[in-house]
Regions:
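Conserved strand-turn element in the central/C-terminal portion of the radical SAM core barrel
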Residues: 110-120, 142-154, 184-186, 193-194, ...
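N-terminal pre-triad scaffold of radical SAM enzymes
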Residues: 37-81, 88-113, 176
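Conserved, mostly hydrophobic/aromatic
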Residues: 18, 42, 72, 112, ...
Length: 390
């Protein structure tokens, strides 16, 4: 079937020949009026990678602190401990552990996000907690930190990137979440997150993670002051990083949310922009296996449509008592939790097969559950042995 926009024919030829798309190609894809053709092309590339599979994970999501001194202009979540102490929260390791188990143990991923908190972001805090999770919940993969937090800990402990990655891997780190990438273009990055890890160090840390066998994801924050050129440049840099040091599992487009931050004048992204971004990412990032449509960001309706535009993952259910605060502080209207049966229905209605996974895309039967003995010891939740059962 021919494309209404003949530019897509040339893009298809390049993809079929294994030729990476250029900056001009990426801009043309963003600007094409043939939305149906764009979706058809992206969908074909998705199905080359993962066929009719669409992935999701049963996970727990925890914000462990909102104390952060990075000062990003797009953030509505961070609290300054000295200027607004009434907003501050900070969980102890025991509180994090108990929160993770609040709704049981039937999950395969623990996703924790915090901030640049000097009292929490240290190896002394995290390594004992990570080892505890690995000892008592070995079926759960730890998806923790961003490159910004890893750089912060490296500076704090006077360690090189290889040394800090080695220390975290030894404690049980399975996957790094992919945040803090924002936009790599220096002119834009210097305006939205001047105190955060540089684009070069973000890439260097992720490549070191991959060299040491720790997987990661990659994100892009779009819909604020960046240009289309910035977006395509960001994708090209990620593609080149994947060529040098394979290990990125998924790319996650993150739509900017404007409520309560310095960039509120930018407003909300529109549905067509969201859908185009998923499709362009699938076509530009030929060496990324997965493009994730995170329902917490774009909402379930847009994410279901994104499955027809190159996305093949809807991220995690979260726990029924989890409370995501970063995007909810910025105005998201998404809920906090999606029952896995709802994920399966949405995926099947889009014409795909739901696949339960963990952080590194190992697949599980949909009805898989861990066998865990729970007990209460001196008022705290403790676990016994863990093994999977169908």
């Amino acid at each position: 079937m021919p494309y209404a926009d003949t530019m897509l024919v040339e893009v298809e030829r390049k993809l079929d020949a294994g030729v990476p798309l250029s900056m001009d190609d990426g801009l043309a894809l963003y600007r094409t009026w043939d939305l149906h053709g764009l979706g058809r092309l992206a969908r074909a590339q998705k199905e080359r990678k993962s066929g009719k599979k669409v992935f999701y994970v049963l996970n727990r999501y925890i914000n462990s602190t909102n104390v952060c001194f990075a000062g990003c202009t797009f953030c509505s979540f961070a609290a300054d401990e000295f200027k607004e102490p009434q907003r501050v929260f900070r969980m102890t390791p025991d509180q994090v552990f108990a929160k993770a188990l609040e709704t049981g143990t039937n999950f395969n991923q623990l996703h924790i996000v915090g901030g640049h908190d000097p009292r929490q972001l240290s190896l002394d805090y995290w390594r004992p907690l990570m080892r505890r999770f690995k000892s008592e919940l070995p079926h759960v993969q730890l998806s923790l930190f961003t490159a910004a937090e890893i750089e912060y800990m490296a500076k704090r402990h006077r360690l090189s990137f290889p040394e800090i990655v080695s220390a975290l891997k030894e404690a049980g780190l399975d996957n790094v979440n992919g945040g803090a990438a924002e936009i790599f273009a220096e002119g834009t990055r210097s305006k939205i997150c001047p105190n955060k890890v540089s684009a070069e160090n973000w890439v260097a840390i992720h490549e070191e993670l991959h060299r040491q066998g720790v997987a990661s994801n990659a994100t892009m924050l779009y819909g604020h002051i960046e240009s289309l050129e910035d977006r395509v440049d960001h994708m090209i840099r990620l593609r080149e990083s994947q060529e040098r040091s394979p290990g990125y599992n998924a790319f996650i487009p993150l739509a900017f949310h404007p409520d309560g931050n310095e960039l509120s004048y930018c407003g909300w992204t529109m549905g067509l922009d969201d859908i185009r971004t998923f499709a362009v990412a699938r076509l530009m990032l030929h060496n990324f296996d997965h493009i994730k449509a995170y329902w917490m960001i774009q909402g379930l309706n847009v994410c279901q449509v994104a499955l027809q535009f190159g996305a093949d993952d809807m991220d995690g259910t979260h726990g029924s008592t989890d409370a995501e605060m970063i995007y909810h502080s910025a105005g998201t209207q998404s809920g906090q939790y999606v029952d896995d049966r709802e994920f399966r229905r949405l995926i099947e209605d889009a014409g795909y097969t739901p696949i339960r996974r963990n952080s590194t895309y190992n697949e599980f039967p949909l009805d898989w559950t861990p066998s865990v003995t729970l007990s209460v010891v001196e008022g705290q939740l403790a676990t016994g042995s863990v093994e999977g059962r169908k």
